[in-house]
Amino acid sequence: MVIVLMGVSGSGKTTIGHCLAEQLGWPFYEGDDFHPPANVAKMSQGIPLSDDDRLPWLDRLRDLICEYVESDKNAIVACSALKELYRRRLAQAGDRVCFVYLQGDYDLIEERMEARQNHFMKAGLLESQFQTLEEPEKALVVDISEPPEAIVGFIRDQLGL
């Protein structure tokens, strides 16, 4: 199984991903690490990414996910996956891909982003992320107002892990 932790920037994908990976003994991949330098530069300057910017990045993540699914191994991937188009692209590996949507309100996430240091994604881009977001119909939805330990426990319970 490959768990894709999705949601807007600041929703806790990295924190939850590391916690899940530690508890399950699965590898964790930070989707941000797969962005080409041009994407990172744009976001660092407060410029939202277009679909054309995102597609090569999504293809790199899709290829990683396919490797795990095809070899019958487990992994956790953090990826915003804001649009249904993006999720379909990532899910091309088949039914062993499970999306977990880390859902929270704008104010909570903005507060978290403003507290972050050394991250290229600035709080000023949060509005564009929410505008781009198409809430998923096929995902485990998780309320991020709970502490990370509770979120991880909920995900494990719901997925039978």
Q: Where do the model's predicted regions map?
A:
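Conserved lysine of the Walker
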Residues: K13
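Walker A (P-loop) ATP-phosphate-binding motif of ABC ATPase nucleotide-binding domains
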Residues: V2
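Small-molecule kinase domains that catalyze NTP-dependent phosphoryl transfer to phosphate-bearing small molecules
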Residues: A115-F154
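The conserved Walker
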Residues: S9
